[in-house]
Amino acid sequence: YNIEAGSTPEIILRNIPKGTQDIILTFTDETFKGMRDGGHGILQYSLEEDTYKVIIPTVQGETFDLPDDFTSVVQHRGTQYGKVQGAYLAPCSGGKGNTYSVLIQAVDKKSNELDRAILTLGTY
């Protein structure tokens, strides 16, 4: 994989709802229409039962070689813009001031949403 491809940030979650089995991470470019709604990839991170707090580790961009406990739900859509296939695509606007975010969802074993939060990752 391309070590220069960037990676997801480490995310610290607290007060995870009881019954949460997975955390769904939907990475989005809020500015560029073609990469909204998970355009930078959707990842699932599996938790042990009744986890209250977790540090979600980073995931390398432009690869499907994911760390333990991660699953690619939807690969990034950057291939239509010349990027290498993979589960996640790091911010890549080239400094145009795009805003990037991640929708964080706690889901139970039946994929019912228990809680959600949107975290703005920054502008690049």
What are these model-derived regions, one by one?
Residues 1-124:
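N-terminus-centered regions that define maturation/targeting leaders and the start
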